[in-house]
Each structure stands twice: as structure tokens, then as C-alpha cells.
A protein has these predicted regions:
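C-terminal cap of thioredoxin/glutaredoxin-like
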Residues: 3-6, 13-30, 38, 100, ...
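Structural alpha/beta surface segment adjacent to cysteine/selenocysteine redox centers
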Residues: 19-127
Length: 212
């Protein structure tokens, strides 16, 4: 059984969804039989590599969604508590907003080497917890090495247009399946889990799909 997961490394609910999915897998008797593939999706593909409010995530979201600064801050505070409930530490005050394509190119390279999950995990943590700049080449090289890639792998991912094409094709494929937001889990192209659903909901879907 194959699980495809569309995700953006700048999406706070995608990291939470990853944790909930992992919790569901721990309870799923056939977890070892699953093939899991991460897919790229950008929530804001038109974002500049260095946006105007790079060091102010609250202002960025307020401007993009039409919220007040206070509303944006309150929403993020709620997400921090949600993340904490699944064992994640979110430091939005340190987050550096940037276009996520470079990160997705790294993920595409990592997938080819069987390191897709490791790449997602490390890049999520780099952005939400560590306050890393995911547009900075040296930072991406260091993160790539932690994932299990070489400096040459990272350079190849960031310079060869095929990796951008792979990421963009993932997004197009998701749209064809009805994707409107992330995280988006597709189980054997039969069932979909939309959003960071609870482990119980995810487990129920996995068991239903496995039963045929």
C-alpha cells in the first residue's frame, strides 16, 4: 500500500501532520508494508526569495491574509500550543520567511537517495524550531549533510533545473487529485486525508484502505 504526502516545509500544520501520521503508523499493524513518498507543494510559489518581512512571520501572514498584526500573532500562538501537544517546539519569533523552492529541490534529491523522510524532518525542524534561513546556500549544504547528502548533491539539486521541475510536477499532480491545501495524504489513490487530522482519523483511514 502506498501513501503519498503533499507538503510544504513552510507549513506549520504539515509538520504537525507528520507527527500525527507517525503516531498512527505506530498503531497500524501493517506499517512495515507501506511505501511512503513525500511530494512537494508550495503554499506561496510567487514569494520572493527574500521577502519584505523576512524576519517577521506575523507581519507576512497578516499582509497576505488581510489580518491585523494582533490576529496573526494570536493565530500563531495557538499553533505553537497545538505543536507542543504533539511534541514539537515552534519558535515563530525566530522564523525567517523565504520562498521554499530551494528546500523542495533538496527534498527531491533526497528522495532519489531514499532520504525523503529525513529531509522533510530536518527542514521542518530547521525552519520552525531552529530559525534557519532556508534560502542560504551554506545553511542548506550543512542541513544536506545532516540529512545524508554530500555537498555535491546539494549543489546539483540547487543548480540542475530537473529538481525544480520535479517539485513543480508534484504540485501539478496534487492539483489533478483535488489538492487545495496541505498536508494532503493520498492512500493508494483511493482515499485522501486532508489537513493535520488526528492519529485516530489517520489510523481509521489506513485500516479501511488496507481492508480493501
Amino acid at each position: 500500500m502506498k501513501i503519498e504526502i503533499w507538503s510544504d516545509i513552510m507549513c506549520p500544520f504539515c509538520y504537525i501532520g507528520k507527527r500525527n501520521f507517525e503516531s498512527a503508523l505506530k498503531q497500524f499493524a501493517h506499517a512495515e508494508d507501506l511505501v511512503i513518498e513525500w511530494k512537494s507543494f508550495q503554499l506561496d510559489p510567487a514569494m520572493a526569495e527574500v521577502p519584505e518581512y523576512q524576519d517577521d512571520l506575523y507581519r507576512y501572514l497578516a499582509d497576505r491574509k488581510g489580518f491585523s498584526y494582533e490576529e496573526s500573532k494570536a493565530m500563531h500562538d495557538n499553533v505553537v500550543q497545538y505543536a507542543k501537544s504533539v511534541g514539537l517546539e515552534y519558535n515563530f519569533d525566530r522564523a525567517l520567511v523565504t520562498n521554499s523552492m530551494k528546500g523542495h529541490r533538496i527534498i527531491q534529491m533526497a528522495k532519489m537517495k531514499g532520504l525523503g523522510d529525513e529531509a522533510e524532518e530536518r527542514l521542518f525542524r530547521a525552519y520552525f524550531t531552529d530559525g534557519k534561513n532556508l534560502n542560504d546556500i551554506e545553511t542548506l549544504v550543512d542541513l544536506g549533510k545532516e540529512i545524508g547528502l554530500t555537498e555535491g548533491d546539494v549543489d546539483e539539486a540547487l543548480t540542475n533545473p530537473i529538481y525544480m521541475e520535479k517539485a513543480e510536477n508534484d504540485s501539478k499532480e496534487g492539483a489533478m487529485l483535488g489538492l487545495t491545501g496541505v498536508p494532503f495524504f493520498v492512500v493508494d489513490r483511493k482515499y485522501a486525508i486532508v489537513g493535520a487530522q488526528s492519529p485516530a482519523v489517520m489510523l481509521q483511514t489506513l485500516e479501511k484502505a488496507f481492508a480493501g
